[in-house]
A protein has these predicted regions:
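Metal-dependent amide/peptide-bond hydrolase catalytic core
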Residues: 195, 200, 210-395
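Conserved acidic residues
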Residues: 39, 153-154, 338
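Histidine/acidic-residue-rich, glycine-tolerant segments that coordinate divalent metal ions
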Residues: 53, 73-75, 81-91, 98, ...
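Acidic/His- and Gly-rich active-site-bordering loop/insert found
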Residues: 1-92, 101, 108-123
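Solvent-exposed residues in well-ordered beta-strands and their adjoining turns
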Residues: 55, 69-71, 130, 187-191, ...
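Short Gly/Pro-enriched turn/cap motifs at secondary-structure boundaries
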Residues: 43, 133, 174-179, 322-323, ...
Length: 395
C-alpha cells in the first residue's frame, strides 16, 4: 500500500464515523486498531484521549509530541461523497479526519523506521489523539493528565488544514499565529408590558431589553472599530434573542458572541470597553444586565526558539504576515511545553480546475471550514506527512 492509499483509507474511514466532544467510541476504537500492531505503548491518560509512545531505542532523554484532534461537528453533511458521514447530523467539517490520518500515517512511518533503520529517528515520539477541540478544549485535560511529564516530551507539533491557502502550502510563523478567544454572554433584564402602555414613556424609562440590546450592538461595533485600529481585535455577536411576542416590550434579551485578540492587554481593553458600552445601553433604557466572559482558548503562540530550530528543515515554509483571528486549543499545549503549529493549504491553486474523483471528492477544498460541503483530496495530506517525517529526524 502506498502512503497516499494509506492516508486515503484512514481519512475516508474516519470521515464516515464523525463523533462529537468527548463521546468518541468508534473513533477511538479505529485509532487503537491502527496502533495495535505497532511497537508502541498505547495509553489513555485522560477521558477519550489516546496516546502512543514510541521508544526510538537510542537512549533518548526526551520525546517529540505530535497532536491530532478527533472530534467532529454537529453538521448534517451535504457533500454527496461516497464516503459521507453515516452518523446523521454529524460531520468532519473542520478537517480533523485529515489531522488524524496524517498522525496515524506518521505513526506507521515511525514504527517502520525504528525497526528497519535503527538510529535514524533519534528522539522518542509521543502521538496525542485528543477529544473536544471544538467544544471545551480537550487539550487542557491532556496537559493536566501528566502524560508529557511521564514520557518526557519537550516539544509538540500540530497541523490544521486551511482552505484559504492554495493546496499544499505550508504556513506558520514565529510568535502569535492564532487568536485568544472568549465567548461572551449577556442577559439584559427589562420589564415586559403591552406596547399600548408605552406611548409617551421616555426611552430611559422604557425597560425595553430589545432596545438595550440594539443600542449595545451598535456601540460595540464602533468600539471594536476603534480598538482594531491599534492592533487586531474583533468582537462579534451572532446570537440575539429578545421577547416572546410581537406586541409587548421585550422583558429579557440574550446576546452572545465571541471576542478574539492576541494580547492580554487588548483583551483587558476590549472587555472593559464591552462593559462600558453595555452600562451605557442599559442605563439609557432603564434595564439591568448580567455579563459573562467565558474562559476561552489562549492565543496560539509559536515558540520562537523551537520555530527557529525547525524552519531550516522546511524550505517551503511560508511565513504568515498577520496572525489569524481564529482560535485553536493547541494553545494549551504551548503553555505547557514549546510548540509550533502549522497551517496546511487545501484550497484551489490559482489557474487550476477542480475535478472530483469517482467517489465525489474534489481535488481541492472549495468550501470553508465548518460548512456542510467541506471536502479536500487526501493527496494534500502527503505534504503534512512529509513535514512530520522531517521534524522527527531532528535531534
Amino acid at each position: 500500500m502506498t502512503e497516499l492509499q494509506e492516508l486515503r483509507r484512514y481519512r475516508r474511514d474516519l470521515h464516515r464515523i464523525p463523533e462529537l466532544d468527548f463521546d468518541l467510541p468508534q473513533t477511538i476504537a479505529y485509532i487503537e486498531g491502527v496502533l495495535a500492531p505497532l511497537a508502541c505503548e498505547v495509553t489513555h491518560p485522560c477521558p477519550s484521549c489516546v496516546c502512543a509512545f514510541f521508544d526510538a531505542g537510542t537512549g533518548a532523554a526526551h520525546a517529540t509530541a505530535i497532536r491530532a484532534d478527533m472530534d467532529a461537528l454537529p453538521i448534517a453533511e451535504a457533500t454527496g461523497a461516497a464516503f459521507s458521514s453515516t452518523h446523521p447530523g454529524k460531520m468532519h467539517a473542520c478537517g480533523h479526519d485529515g489531522h488524524m490520518s496524517m498522525a496515524l500515517a506518521a505513526a506507521t512511518h515511525v514504527d517502520r523506521t525504528i525497526r528497519e533503520q535503527p538510529g535514524v529517528i533519534k528522539r522518542n515520539v509521543l502521538f496525542v489523539f485528543q477529544p473536544a477541540e471544538e467544544t471545551t478544549g480537550g487539550a487542557k485535560t491532556v496537559c493536566e493528565s501528566g502524560v508529557f511529564e511521564r514520557y518526557r516530551a519537550d516539544c509538540i507539533f500540530g497541523f490544521h488544514v486551511w482552505p484559504d491557502l492554495p493546496a499544499g502550502t505550508l504556513a506558520s510563523c514565529s510568535g502569535p499565529l492564532l487568536a485568544r478567544s472568549s465567548e461572551t454572554h449577556i442577559h439584559i433584564h427589562g420589564m415586559s408590558i403591552h406596547i399600548a402602555k408605552t406611548y409617551g414613556v421616555p426611552v430611559g424609562e422604557s425597560h425595553d431589553a430589545a432596545l438595550a440590546a440594539a443600542k449595545f450592538l451598535v456601540s460595540e461595533r464602533e468600539l471594536m472599530d476603534e480598538l482594531g485600529a491599534d492592533e487586531p481585535c474583533i468582537g462579534k455577536f451572532g446570537l440575539l434573542q429578545a421577547g416572546t411576542v410581537c406586541n409587548a416590550v421585550a422583558g429579557e434579551a440574550h446576546v452572545a458572541g465571541s471576542l478574539r485578540v492576541f494580547t492580554d492587554d487588548m483583551f483587558d481593553r476590549a472587555r472593559e470597553g464591552v462593559r462600558r458600552v453595555l452600562d451605557d445601553a442599559c442605563a439609557a433604557t432603564g434595564c439591568t444586565y448580567d455579563l459573562d466572559f467565558a474562559e476561552g482558548y489562549p492565543p496560539v503562540d509559536n515558540d520562537p526558539e523551537l520555530f527557529a530550530n525547525v524552519a531550516p528543515a522546511l524550505s517551503e515554509l511560508q511565513l504568515v504576515d498577520e496572525p489569524l483571528l481564529i482560535a485553536e486549543d493547541f494553545a494549551f499545549y504551548q503553555r505547557h511545553l514549546p510548540g509550533v503549529f502549522f497551517l496546511l493549504g487545501t484550497g484551489v491553486p490559482e489557474g487550476h480546475e477542480n475535478p472530483s474523483d469517482s467517489d465525489g471528492c474534489p481535488a481541492y477544498a472549495t468550501s470553508a471550514l465548518h460548512t456542510d460541503t467541506m471536502l479536500f483530496d487526501e493527496e494534500i495530506l502527503l505534504k503534512g506527512l512529509d513535514v512530520y517525517k522531517r521534524l522527527l529526524l531532528l535531534a
